[in-house]
Amino acid sequence: MPLVDSPAIDLDIKEWMLGPSTNISNELGKPILIKVFQVNCPGCFTHGIPEVLEIRAKFIDSPLLIWGLATAFEDFHLNNLDNLKKLIDSGEVVGETLAVLSAKGLLNNNRLDYSIPFPVALDNVVPYNPSDYLSEAQNFIKKDFPQFDSFPVKNQKLISDQVMTYLKQKKFEAKTFETYQLKGTPSTLLIDNKGILRGKWFGSDYGLEKEVEKLLSL
């Protein structure tokens, strides 16, 4: 797992859907903002991507590169290549994204009223077949429950059992999502012009504009 202020690891990409094929190590000298999203993720389209569109408009004359990374850690029947193609080609959305954005009046004929204007890649989603479920569970708990050791024994057992059940039902994993140990979508990665990971966040509304300004000042 790359830590903040350490070298960023290249994205493990299945396919570039929009824009030229590239990667972090190919773009040294340029700062990069990567918005990680899922097709079936309403918050990605009510907050995550609109936030990046605002950043793009504000910093259009800067050297900042902006990429989208479509990943999948759930709902694999919706978060897939076919639905990403629909999104890229026509703005068509599906699943909970369709339901929520329709209810908010944000769609036109089940489509976004804008096109995504930056390169988008598909995370490499592969079958999940760990050799050691116990080790996987311990790593999962360490990532998502940093105060685990301070919990009562009863709570520790409950969490451990739930995590193990989840992992044994898990069929696929998204390589970049797992490598960066992201907690959900939308998430954001900021990488400086020397290829150093300078920020990693889950969610929106955490002052991304100021973080980008700091990145560009390095």
Give the location of each predicted region.
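Flexible, glycine-rich phosphate/dinucleotide-binding loops
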Residues: 42, 75, 127-129, 197, ...
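Structural microenvironment flanking redox-active thiols in thiol-disulfide oxidoreductases
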Residues: 46-137, 144-151
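Short active-site neighborhood of thiol/selenol oxidoreductases, capturing the structured segment around
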Residues: 22-53, 65-69
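N-terminal "domain-start" segment that seeds a small globular fold
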Residues: 1-25, 157, 161-164
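Active-site acidic short loop of glycosyltransferases
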Residues: 28-30, 61, 182, 191
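Short, P/G- and charge-enriched loop/turn segments at secondary-structure junctions
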Residues: 1, 106-108, 174-178
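Thiol-/selenol-based redox modules, centered on thioredoxin-like
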Residues: 140-218
